[in-house]
């Protein structure tokens, strides 16, 4: 499924021609995967969906650090998943896979996720994509929104006027029916751990 852009802060999707920047492991220096895993607090045998996984850099690293969980990296851009699949081909991991949102397998993921990671995509997510995240979660599931902080000058990431401040991001997820359980700041990012409102 291709998501419309209604409600998104950034005017257009990430350009796959810039995908090489997503494979840069120095991203882990300012946004460590271990910290994201800790915030999500997944149980062994849990299912994590990396929503908007891009080239799979974080999905693959999290799968390597947590061999007891299943990691599914989903993306709506087929070109991104080609890069993801190339990266997977160089990995011996069996607990991670790439899933296209237009594939039948994606439709079977509804209400299957113990956790959803929405990394660097909140500013790109239209209303329909937010609904998709809700649909993927089990009733007790958690979603971790981690996005660029518009209040911080930084040498990387999208323009500041294309992303939210932590308060704006918080209001966005609350307005969409999530409850914020925990918040954290990183050098260039903010994180919101959320659950579904009862």
Regions from the PLM with identified roles:
Residues 114-127:
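A short SAM/SAH-binding and catalytic strip from SAM-dependent methyltransferases
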Residues 20, 26-27, 142-193:
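C-terminal alpha-helical "lid/dimerization" subdomain adjacent to the S-adenosyl-L-methionine
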Residues 106-116:
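A short acidic, Gly/Pro-enriched loop at the edge of an enzyme's catalytic core
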Residues 129-142:
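A short glycine-rich, Lys/Arg-flanked "PGG" loop and its adjoining helix->strand segment in the class I
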Residues 4-31:
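Class I SAM-dependent methyltransferase Rossmann-like catalytic core
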Residues 49, 55-105:
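Class I SAM-dependent methyltransferase SAM/SAH-binding core
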Residues 66, 125, 137-139:
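Helix-to-beta-strand junctions that scaffold the AdoMet/dcAdoMet cofactor pocket
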Residues 27-45:
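Conserved alpha-helix/loop element of class I SAM-dependent methyltransferases that forms part
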């Amino acid at each position: 499924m291709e998501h419309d852009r209604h409600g998104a802060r950034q005017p257009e999707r990430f350009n796959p021609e810039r995908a090489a920047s997503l494979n840069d492991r120095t991203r882990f220096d300012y946004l460590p995967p271990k910290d994201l895993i800790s915030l999500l607090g997944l149980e062994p045998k849990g299912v994590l969906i990396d929503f908007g996984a891009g080239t799979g850099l974080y999905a693959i690293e999290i799968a390597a650090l947590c061999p007891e969980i299943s990691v599914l990296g989903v993306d709506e851009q087929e070109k991104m998943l080609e890069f993801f699949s190339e990266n997977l081909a160089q990995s011996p991991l069996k607990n991670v896979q790439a899933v296209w949102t237009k594939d039948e397998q994606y439709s079977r993921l509804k209400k299957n996720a113990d956790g959803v990671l929405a990394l660097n995509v909140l500013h790109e997510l239209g209303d329909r994509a937010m609904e998709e995240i809700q649909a993927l979660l089990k009733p007790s599931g958690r979603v971790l929104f981690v996005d660029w902080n518009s209040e911080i000058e930084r040498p990387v990431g999208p323009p500041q006027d294309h992303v939210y401040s932590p308060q704006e991001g918080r209001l966005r997820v609350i307005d969409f029916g999530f409850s914020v359980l925990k918040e954290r700041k990183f050098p260039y990012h903010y994180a919101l751990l959320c659950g579904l409102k009862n």
